[in-house]
Regions:
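Accessory regions of macromolecular translocation/handling assemblies
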Residues: 1-188, 195-208, 508, 512-536, ...
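P-loop NTPase motor domains
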Residues: 4-8, 36-44, 156-449, 464, ...
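A short glycine-/small-residue-rich loop at the edge of a beta-strand within enzyme catalytic domains
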Residues: 125, 131, 392, 428, ...
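Conserved long hydrophobic alpha-helices within structured protein cores
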Residues: 131-137, 392-400, 493
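Conserved ATP-driven motor cores of ASCE-family P-loop NTPases powering translocation/secretion/packaging/pilus
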Residues: 441-543
């Protein structure tokens, strides 16, 4: 029985301990010290009134209060007095607790929202003291290039979403000012090809290696060969995926899943063969097209073997487990008629390569994409803003660029490139789909790579990247709105800015035999900037949002105040960069170097 009672008592004590669980004893003691005074008061008052004899408790309390001057301040150890003191302290604690639980929360002036415009003190922790080490956003707001500030809470990525309608100054107020900073390597999308003319000389004379990929005029472009950057089978798959995503097949079946997968198998097999087996000079799209042209299929003769079949047959004998052989055997499972449809779609998809100038452009490589993070380089990617026929070339280039730089940062430089690479992606919607871009933009930050996505409207991003558009936007810590009236963009911006609380006066007048007037004062909520106000925003103003900071309504950057403005063609027409002369001189240097090497070999 004793044992059972002990167990019951232990269980009761355990329940009490769990009920009064104290996570922080020190904090518990400090918070309850004030209540000891009430315990003391209750104790000595109980002792005082109980010193009187006769009458009931009310009489003794009355007499005790009237003789309060005789109160003794020495506490009593009488259990009854101690209990009264504890009861008084407990009652006060209960009242305070109850008040705290039921107290009303007032936020004066913030009843309907606390949104406000940012001030200079809000952006100050994010600005680098040295002007040249900043990303230029507005005339008063900048963002340090230092990805590891002293206080980590001020660390922000350098990805910027820039939105502005046609004529809002995306190039003048954002791209050019940031090129004038000259603190990084730059990869710039250049619609119409004017940026390289206006800024190229400034960059070249400041030690930049200028690269140009021109999809408008191939004769004014350096050569780009995607095959030069294939390092593994993984790269082959990425190249095939980018080609499929940014080109179109032929016929009503071209977009169906089966035919697309069949095309992927065929491209993968052929590119795999070229990568592993072809001589260095033949590793290009011309060889790929020649192989497709040689892939004759006869519907009435399943046993017919074309030259490509014989190539793969010989390769299989040499290496049955070869990557290209495995892909080709899967493709060959298709019957003659099906294989013919696949080949037709392949031919249509790669039809742009029938243009001799494009084949020549992609026959060898001069861009050296993998070296952009090694030294200061400016790559201008010139695309047409009216015709997207050759934009798939740009999409392939960007896809390879991001993957090459990330791999080099990890494999060679321990995770961070020695020179930060800023990608100023003007007319981003015209570049095409960059596979897995939503994942790339989330990971490039740590490798010293950043992307500025420049759009005319936010809906353009959703049209290309569908459900991944929000992920891409979420990985841009900065958003700059330069003006526009596209409904979706304006609505989302107004909602993001939030609401502020304003004062509202209502007046009323009643007309009858006797006139009466009324005045009513109240508070209400209003958008910090309504959709209507955003659409009619002053052309010289812009809105900048930085993660974790109040938004800024500021003047656009005044390009003429930058110290390097005098180096632009905008300032002096003599600063025009002669692209043809630059490319000709490079070719001469290249020819001399090749001649010297050949002579040494002889």
């Amino acid at each position: 029985k004793v044992s059972t009672m002990n167990k019951i008592l232990e269980a009761i004590l355990s329940d009490i301990k769990n009920l009064i669980k104290i996570d922080n004893p020190k904090k518990f003691i400090l918070s309850n010290i004030p209540y000891l005074s009430f315990l003391y008061i209750g104790n000595i008052f109980s002792k005082h009134i109980n010193s009187y004899v006769g009458g009931d408790i009310i009489d003794r309390i009355t007499v005790g209060i009237s003789d309060i001057g005789t109160l003794s301040y020495i506490p009593s150890l009488n259990p009854r007095d101690l209990l009264v003191g504890i009861s008084v302290a407990g009652l006060v604690k209960l009242i305070v607790y109850s008040k705290g639980k039921n107290k009303k929360k007032y936020r004066q002036g913030k009843e309907y929202g606390s949104a406000r415009w940012g001030e200079s003190k809000d952006i100050a922790p994010y600005i680098d003291p040295k002007f040249e080490n900043n990303v230029l956003i507005t005339n008063t707001e900048r963002l340090t290039m230092n990805s590891r500030p002293k206080n980590p809470k001020y660390a922000r990525n350098k990805n910027v979403l820039v939105i502005g309608g046609s004529g809002s100054g995306k190039t003048r107020f954002y791209v050019k000012p940031n090129l004038m900073q000259m603190h990084s390597s730059y990869v710039v999308t250049d619609p119409k090809g004017t940026l390289v003319l206006e800024c190229g000389k400034m960059l070249y004379e400041n030690g930049y290696d200028i690269k140009i990929l021109n999809t408008i005029n191939f004769k004014k472009s350096m050569k780009y060969n995607p095959f030069a950057y294939l390092r593994s089978e993984k790269d082959i798959l990425k190249l095939v995926q980018t080609i499929i995503a940014n080109t179109k097949g032929d016929g009503e079946k071209a977009g169906e899943d089966f035919w697309v997968k069949a095309e992927k198998l065929y491209y993968t097999a052929l590119i795999g063969y070229i990568y592993y087996e072809a001589p260095e000079k033949e590793k290009n799209f011309k060889t790929l097209l020649d192989m497709i042209d040689a892939s004759e299929v006869r519907e009435d003769d399943e046993t017919y073997m074309n030259p490509i079949d014989r190539l793969f047959e010989a390769l299989e004998k040499k290496d049955p487990s070869h990557f290209a052989v495995k892909q080709y055997k899967k493709y060959k499972l298709a019957a003659g008629k099906t294989a013919k449809s696949i080949l037709i779609s392949c031919g249509a998809r790669l039809a742009p390569f029938d243009i001799r100038e494009l084949r020549e452009l992609m026959s060898e490589d001069e861009l050296e994409l993998d070296k952009i993070g090694d030294r200061k380089t400016a790559l201008f990617v010139i695309i047409s803003d009216t015709d997207d026929t050759f934009n798939f070339v740009v999409s392939i280039m960007y896809s390879q660029l991001f993957n090459l730089l990330c791999d080099k940062a990890d494999d060679v430089y321990g995770g961070r490139l020695p020179v930060h690479v800023r990608c100023l992606l003007d007319e981003f919607a015209n570049i095409g789909l960059i596979p897995k871009f939503e994942k790339l933009i989330a990971t490039i930050r740590s490798r010293e790579i950043s992307a500025s996505i420049i759009l005319q409207a936010q809906s353009q991003l959703k049209a290309i990247y569908k459900d991944h558009a929000d992920t891409i936007v979420g990985n841009c810590d900065s958003t700059l709105f330069l003006g526009g009236k596209e409904k979706t963009t304006v609505k989302e911006l107004s909602e993001t800015l939030g609401k502020e609380t304003i004062d509202l006066y209502n007046t009323s007048e009643t007309r009858s035999n006797q006139k009466s007037f009324g005045l009513n004062y109240q508070k209400t909520g209003k958008e910090l900037m309504s959709q209507d106000e955003i659409t009619v925003m002053d052309g010289g103003k812009c809105i900048y949002q930085l993660r974790g900071v109040r938004p800024f309504l500021s003047d656009k950057f005044d390009i003429t105040k930058h110290k390097n403005y005098r180096l632009l063609e905008d300032y002096d027409k003599n600063n025009l960069f002669d692209v043809e002369e630059y490319l000709t001189n490079r070719d001469k240097v290249k020819l001399k170097s090749s001649y010297k090497i050949n002579r040494l070999n002889i």
